Regions:
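Phosphate/pyrophosphate- and phosphate-bearing ligand-binding catalytic cores of soluble enzymes
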Residues: 15-16, 22-24, 67, 164-280
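A gly/ser-rich beta-alpha-beta helix-loop segment of oxidoreductase catalytic cores
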Residues: 115-165, 237
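Noncatalytic linker/hinge segments flanking ATPase motor cores
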Residues: 80, 98-102, 109-116, 148-152, ...
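Solvent-exposed alpha-helices and their adjacent loops that cap or buttress functional pockets
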Residues: 26-29, 52-53, 59-61, 69-72, ...
């Protein structure tokens, strides 16, 4: 049985040479050698194991933000993570059995869009993710890169993350296990490591959220969203390009150099916010 047959046996259809420009917020990127979509955690895990068994490089693609894909594309298997379930822990008891799963946790599969989950939890009167209502990307991306805005970040409310290293069993890592720093984590370091090193596949995450007043929380979230819309570009981009240095802002530094609005080809330093490069 060859690789293509093994993927089909997993119940997943695949494409050859799929343009990744269709799957990134930058709207650029060459072809994926193999491309498949995982709608369930089981499919995601199976595809990771198939790739390992056949020695095919694996890349898991979330929302396509914070990502720059070469015109040469990506070799191996690119899996679009389309797992979308999230809700109170009780809904996941049968699927995710682990002592770290507490009744008061909000659980999300890794492909859940962060902004949509933040809107749902905020409307439900659960405090902690109001900052994320304007953030593109998935839960997995937020967990890996410690996404944040408006004075908070993912690490502030993350309780645990469920991962699988291909060839191994599922593991639950606590927030302390992830060694969070500004826009980074142990998971990010592992994913940026050498290809021969086993890289984690993020499956799900649990968030500890406090009870709050939905009206107050929604007002705060909407203020964050309005502030973002007023200050950030609407053109295709990967989001903020550079991390802020201590005590300053990357956008301010770039603007002070006179680079705001500078353009080469179709790439432009956004005239609205200098820490964004937009695809014109």
């Amino acid at each position: 049985m060859n690789f293509a047959e093994a993927v089909r046996r997993a119940g997943v259809e695949f494409l050859r040479d799929e343009p990744l420009a269709k799957h990134t917020t930058f709207r650029i990127g060459g072809p994926a050698e193999w491309f498949a979509a995982a709608a369930t955690l089981e499919q995601l895990e199976t595809l990771a194991e198939v790739a390992l068994a056949y020695g095919v490089p694996l890349t898991v693609l979330g929302g396509g933000s914070n990502l720059l894909v070469s015109d040469a594309g990506i070799r191996g298997l690119v899996v679009a993570n389309q797992t979308r379930r999230h809700g109170p822990a009780a809904q996941f008891r049968e699927q995710l059995q682990h002592p770290a799963l507490r009744d008061d946790h909000w659980v999300a599969e890794s492909g859940v869009m962060l902004a949509g989950m933040a809107r749902t939890t905020t409307r439900s009167g659960l405090a902690g993710l109001e900052w994320a209502i304007s953030i593109p990307g998935t839960v997995a991306g937020a967990v890996i890169g410690n996404a944040g805005a408006h004075g908070s970040d993912t690490a502030a409310n993350l309780a645990w993350v469920l991962v699988r290293y291909p060839g191994c069993r599922r593991q639950v890592l606590t927030r302390d296990d992830l060694h969070y720093t500004y826009r980074s984590s142990r998971l990010r370091e592992q994913l940026l490591g050498p290809r021969e090193q086993k890289r984690p596949v993020i499956l799900a995450a649990g968030f500890a959220l406090a009870q709050g007043d939905p009206v107050v929380l929604l007002h705060r979230a909407d203020e964050n969203l309005a502030r973002r819309r007023a200050s950030q570009p609407v053109e295709p981009s990967a989001g903020s390009i550079f991390r802020n240095p201590a005590g300053d802002f990357a956008g301010r530094l770039i603007e002070s150099l006179g680079m705001k609005g500078h353009q080469i080809g179709g790439a432009q330093v956004s005239p609205r916010h200098a820490n964004f490069i937009v695809n014109t």
